[in-house]
A protein has these predicted regions:
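NAD(P)H dinucleotide-binding glycine-rich loop of Rossmann-like/cofactor-binding domains
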Residues: 74-79, 87-155
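Short polar catalytic/cofactor-binding loops
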Residues: 11-17, 46-48
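Short glycine/threonine/proline-enriched tight-turn/helix- or strand-capping micro-motif at secondary-structure
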Residues: 18-30, 60
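Glycine-rich beta-strand-centered segment in the early N-terminal region that forms part
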Residues: 31-48, 57-100
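Residues that mark the start of a beta-strand
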Residues: 7, 38-40, 150
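Short structural boundary motif marking the start of a folded domain
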Residues: 2-9
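N-terminal Rossmann-fold NAD(P) dinucleotide-binding loop
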Residues: 161
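Terminal peptide-recognition signature
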Residues: 8, 43, 135
Length: 161
């Protein structure tokens, strides 16, 4: 495969208050064909998560801030289109921080190949992904519910319940 054109959503400016459309830009970038030990992934689903708002600000945190002019990063599910990496085959479904773009060239580090089973793919970015596991861990590890107690889960309280 030769060079491929990929659309991506980039951070154009740092939001003040609520993010607005003019803080982002849709751009195209040319990606080279994957070289030795690399693979080309087509994004199928991308997640929008609460932590991303903090990364739009230029400040020290547990994750580095998004860079102006660069694609946003977030949990994504994609399909391997082409592979020169022994760990992945064309057609594999992968989960990782692929970025907000149509296509992504990777060396495979940080990607997890998985079989979705009976769940829809997008569930692995929500209820079966980071937010669902955060809620589950919070309930069991922090809340430590005991027999006889009542647990109230409100969908209105955000992605983790």
């Amino acid at each position: 495969m030769s060079t491929i054109t990929s659309r991506e959503i980039r951070l154009k400016s740092r939001p003040e208050g609520m993010p607005a459309a003019d803080n982002f830009e849709l751009a195209e970038s040319a990606l080279p064909a994957p070289s030795q030990n690399e693979l080309l992934v087509k994004n199928l689903y991308m997640s929008v998560d609460p932590y991303m708002r903090g990364r739009m600000m230029d400040r020290q945190s547990y994750l580095p801030p998004f860079q102006i002019g660069q694609p946003l990063e977030g949990g994504s599910i994609g399909e391997v289109v082409e592979s020169n990496n022994d760990q992945f085959n064309a057609g594999d479904i992968v989960l990782g921080m692929l970025g907000w773009r149509e296509y992504f060239v990777s060396n495979g580090k940080g990607l997890m190949r998985f079989e979705p089973g009976n769940a829809p793919l997008q569930a692995f970015l929500g209820t079966l992904g980071m937010t669902g596991l955060t809620a589950y861990s919070g309930l069991l590890e922090v809340g430590k519910p005991a027999e006889g107690e009542t647990v109230f889960v409100s969908a209105a309280s955000g992605a983790v319940g």
